[in-house]
């Protein structure tokens, strides 16, 4: 993932594959990777190759001191169309954060100001050593009510917390599920 050749990616995705459009997620994960697992600059470069077929998502850790400015930079300078949030991301002693933490609200408000509506949250299968409780979908409920102008997309439909996701999505018109990874579970082994 970190060293994908752009030519290979575009050929596999759009020439050999059946995709019409792809979402490029930024995956910060700075405590594990010096420049992030997938950084927004790399995604911005790839989008230049196929702007009509690639939708770039930025990524910011809300615990960063300059997080609001970084959201603005990624939108205005790099062309990010939404954000992918990793609530289980480590940062120093912190082992994650919650989408309903008031420290995140200024980032949502900056996105609204910039006209960016789509907030993706990694709420799927947890891998070691990340904490399972930081992938809990229930923290989406409050901000989706407070910010009805934003779309809260629960990536991987909250697996393995599908019941909680369904209850929240059923009553919140701005909560959606992304089936990435989840589709693999429809096939029998």
Model-derived segments and spans:
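Helix-coil boundary/capping segments in enzymes
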Residues: 1-189
């Amino acid at each position: 993932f970190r060293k994908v050749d752009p030519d290979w990616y575009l050929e596999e995705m759009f020439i050999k594959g059946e995709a019409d459009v792809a979402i490029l997620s930024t995956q910060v994960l700075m405590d594990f990777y010096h420049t992030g697992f997938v950084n927004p600059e790399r995604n911005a470069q790839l989008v230049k190759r196929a702007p009509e077929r690639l939708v770039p998502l930025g990524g910011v850790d809300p615990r960063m001191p300059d997080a609001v400015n970084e959201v603005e930079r990624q939108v205005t300078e790099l062309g990010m169309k939404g954000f992918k949030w990793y609530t289980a991301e480590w940062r120093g002693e912190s082992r994650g954060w919650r989408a309903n933490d008031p420290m995140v609200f200024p980032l949502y408000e900056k996105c609204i100001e910039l006209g960016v509506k789509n907030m993706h949250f990694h709420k799927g299968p947890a891998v070691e050593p990340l904490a399972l409780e930081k992938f809990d979908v229930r923290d989406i409920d409050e901000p989706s009510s407070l910010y009805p102008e934003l779309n809260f997309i629960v990536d991987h439909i909250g697996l393995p917390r599908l019941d909680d996701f369904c209850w929240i999505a059923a009553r919140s018109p701005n909560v959606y599920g992304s089936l990435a990874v989840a589709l693999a579970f429809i096939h029998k082994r």
